[in-house]
C-alpha cells in the first residue's frame, strides 16, 4: 500500500507540473488533429521485472529440514501491439496484447549440518501472452506533450508453464498456466512530427494462486504464490 501511495503522489506532482509549465510556454503543435481519431494503433517495446509474492504454509516453521524460502526477480523484455479507442476528450480504452519474456527464482534453504544450510534455487522461466484492457485518463494537452494515468486488468497465459509436463523424477516447481492481474501506471505522451512517443511505467499484482501442488517439498511448503512486478515500456503510435 505504501508503494501505491508513493506512485499516486508522483503522478499528481507530474500532472501539476505539466499544467504549470504548459500555461507558461506555448509552441506550435505537432499532429494537432491526432487526438480526434476514433481509433488508432501502434506498438510497444519494453523491459520488465517479474517476481513472486510467496505465502508459506502454516506448518512451514514446524519443518525441521526446510529453513528458508524466498523469491528473487530477474529482468526480461516485452513487445506488443496497441489498439486505442477514444471514449472522450480525456479518456481512452486501450487493448495491448503483448508477448512477455521473463524469469524468476525461488530459493530454498535446507538444513545441511547443524550450523549450515544448503541452498536449492529453482529457476522459473515464463513466456506470457498478455491480454490487457486499460482505461487511460489524460491531462490537458500542453504544447507537444500531456501526462496520463491508466489502470485495468489483464489475463495472462504462460506457454512455458510446466504444469502439465511429466517431470520424470526431476523436482521442479510447477505453475498454473492461467493468471489474472490488476495493473496501474502512468506515462507521458510526446507528440513528435510524425508519430506519438510515450514512455510508461506500470506495476502489476497477481490475483490468482499459481502454485500447482504436486506433493513435493518444493510445493507443499507454499500455500500461495502470486505474481508481482513492473514494466517500463516505450510506445510508438
Give the predicted meaning of each segment.
Residues 1-28, 234-237:
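Bacterial Sec-dependent N-terminal signal peptides
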Residues 22-75, 237:
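Short glycine/proline- and aromatic-enriched beta-strand/turn motifs that initiate or cap beta-hairpins
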Residues 27-28, 177-182, 187-237:
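Predominantly the C-terminal beta-signal and adjacent terminal strand-loop region
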Residues 37-41, 73-77, 125-131, 145, ...:
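Residues that define the transmembrane beta-barrel architecture of outer-membrane proteins
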Residues 43-47, 79-85, 97-99, 131-137, ...:
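Residues on the lipid-exposed face of transmembrane beta-strands in outer-membrane beta-barrel proteins
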Residues 51, 90-93, 143, 194-197:
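Repeated loop/turn-to-beta-strand initiation elements of outer-membrane beta-barrel proteins
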Residues 55-70, 103-126, 159-175, 211-223:
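Flexible, solvent-exposed loop segments that connect beta-strands
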Residues 80, 85-120:
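A glycine-rich, hydrophobic loop/mini-helix early in the fold
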